Regions:
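Structural signature of nuclease core domains in nucleic-acid processing machines
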Residues: 1-200
Length: 200
C-alpha cells in the first residue's frame, strides 16, 4: 500500500492489484475514532470522504495504466487505536487473537466478486465479508457490485457539486443534521458561537 495525493487531497493508503488487463484499487482511510461506513450518511452528504478518495485513486490509476480496466476493489475505514480486549488472565492465545482480529477488522464496502475477495484476504479476517456454504455472500456482508460502485461514485460527484454550488451562492444557513441520536453539534468546535439552540 502507498499514500496518494490528488487535487489537494491525500489518501492514507491505496493498494492495487494488477492482472493482465485489469487493475483493482482498494482505498483505506485510517481513523483514530470508531468510524463506520454508512450508506445513509453517504446519501445525506455526511460521509463522502471514502468515495471521493476512491474516485481520485481510480483517476490516478487510470492515468498510470491507460490501457487497462480500472476496477474498485473496496473502500475501508481502519481504526488505528490499539484495541483493548477483555479476557480472563488465563485465556488461551487463540481466544485473545480472535478478539484482536475482530477489533481490527476494517469496515467499508467490498467489490461483490468472491474471487477478488479471497485475493484481498484469504482468511476473511480483515474485511466485512462472509460466505454461505453455497458460496454466496452472507446477508450481513458489506458488498456492492461494479454497477453499484459506479452509481455511488456518480451520486457523490453530484452531491459534491450541489454542496459546492450552495457554498458559492452564499448559503450559510445554520441547519445541522440530526440522524437518530447523532447530530452535527456533538463535536462541532463552533457550537458555543453559532447561535443554534440544540433544544429546538
Amino acid at each position: 500500500g502507498f499514500e496518494v495525493t490528488f487535487g489537494g487531497g491525500r489518501i492514507d493508503r491505496v493498494d492495487i492489484m494488477e492482472d493482465q488487463n485489469k487493475v483493482y484499487v482498494k482505498v483505506i482511510d485510517y481513523k483514530t475514532g470508531n468510524t463506520s461506513f454508512d450508506l445513509v450518511y453517504l446519501y445525506h452528504g455526511l460521509q463522502l470522504q471514502l468515495m471521493i478518495y476512491l474516485d481520485g485513486a481510480l483517476r490516478v490509476e487510470q492515468k498510470k495504466y491507460p490501457d487497462k480496466e480500472i476496477i474498485p476493489a473496496g473502500v475501508f475505514y481502519y481504526n488505528i487505536k490499539d484495541p483493548m480486549i477483555q479476557e480472563k488472565i488465563d485465556a488461551d492465545v487463540e481466544a485473545v487473537s480472535a478478539g484482536l482480529m475482530k477489533e481490527l477488522k476494517m469496515n467499508g464496502l467490498v467489490q461483490a466478486d468472491p474471487e477478488l475477495v479471497y485475493r484481498m484476504d484469504s482468511s476473511l479476517g480483515s474485511i466485512p465479508v462472509a460466505f454461505n456454504k453455497d458460496g454466496s455472500f452472507r446477508k450481513n456482508s458489506s458488498v456492492a457490485d461494479r454497477t453499484q460502485f459506479a452509481v455511488l461514485g456518480r451520486y457523490v460527484r453530484t452531491k459534491i457539486e450541489k454542496i459546492r454550488s450552495s457554498i458559492l451562492e452564499g448559503d450559510a444557513e445554520v441547519s445541522p443534521y440530526e440522524l437518530g441520536k447523532k447530530n452535527a453539534c456533538t463535536y462541532c468546535p463552533y457550537m458555543t458561537v453559532c447561535g443554534f439552540d440544540r433544544r429546538l
